[in-house]
Each structure stands twice: as C-alpha cells, then as structure tokens.
C-alpha cells in the first residue's frame, strides 16, 4: 500500500555544480568573464556543465569559421614578417602575392573535402580574405614603427582565484618599448565602449592587458576585419604611439572618470 501511494514524480533539488579541482585551469578564457558578467547561469551551463548552443544554418562560411580563417592568415603573415619594416619594404604586388599565398594555404584543408558548391564558396571566401587582410595591413603600414612580439600567444592567467587559459591574438612592441595589444574581430559591431563600465561586455582586451602587465601597455585595439569597416579601433596613451586610436584625454568622453592612462588600466584590472 505504501508503494502504491508513492508520488508519481519525485523532485530532487541539486543546486551544486562540479567542483573545481586544485590547480584546475578552467576552460573558457575571456568568454568565462564575458558570460559571467552578462548571465552567470549561462556561464555555468556552458562552461561547467558543457552545454552548447545549437548552430544556426547559414549560407556560405559560418561567422565563427571566418574568424578562425582571418586569424590564421594574419598569424601566418606576421609569424614570418615580424617587423613593420618588412611590410613597408614590399611592393604592392609583393604584398598581394604574399597574402594570397597565406590565404590559399589556410583554405587548402577545406578545399580538400569541398564539393562543387563548397569550392565555389571557398573561391569567394579567398577573395574576401585576401582583400580584408590587405586592408588591415595597409593600416599597419600607416602606423608608427613597431615589431610584432607575439601572435596567437597562449597564457594561463589568474582572475579572482580562478585560473583560465587565454590566447593573445597579437602584441606589438612599439618604438618606446611599450606594447600595443590587439584583438581581431571579423564583425563590424565591436566597439571600445564594450571595455568600459563595471561589467565590461567584451573583457578580452582588459584581460590581455592584465596578462602582459598594465605598466607596459600603451595601446589597446580591436583589429576589425570586415567589409567596409576594416580598421583599428581602440584607445592609446597618447596620439603618437598608435595614431589610428583615440588618445587618452581625461577631459573628454569616455575618459572623464580617470585621472590618467594608468588609472584607466588599473580600473580594468580591478573590475576583472
């Protein structure tokens, strides 16, 4: 009788998550902070429970794949060139040939398994990648002198007692010995305003500044690789170190809450 009287459904409340193990390097990197700031529940589901969002069907190359391809081409170029002077020494034709070689090399594994339609899409992607990378390299050619210190550099960083692994897209050493930290984006929507506020919407670059050491960083930028919008967007300590970026000025937005460039970087570190 007792068995028959049992409830049809039983409720079990378990609000715990898998515990961190000692010295565990938590997956997620900058996305860990991005999700935690926007929605802690989603951060827990995606990064602790392994939940994944369903992919949305799209014509052509998916946005995430396009981003990886652009990163790979730029990495290949700067792995070999390293110095702005090498870029400046190239003729226009040499620059095109160099970039085309890297683009074709990056796309080769995809071409090996593509059908006729896929091959045509990759032809279009090849032209798009080549044009956009050349546009960003032209931006680099117009900058003050620099040397590329790191490309796709892996680091493990401690944030609030949690260790996570990040990859710095690119770090340039400038003429005065300080660093410019660059994060590539293949969408036009990324704005430096996303670094500001108590909960930065896009914390990657503040996190990269922390990894490098804020006292050594004099410029922070998105490298936008996008049709009609390929450019560098970000902030610099002054107008000399990285002329394409907005120089720090405590009397104008968005810097009015900060007494100095160092004060801004310290605020980012504190918020992380």
Enumerate the predicted regions with their spans:
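Structural signature of nuclease core domains in nucleic-acid processing machines
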Residues: 1-272
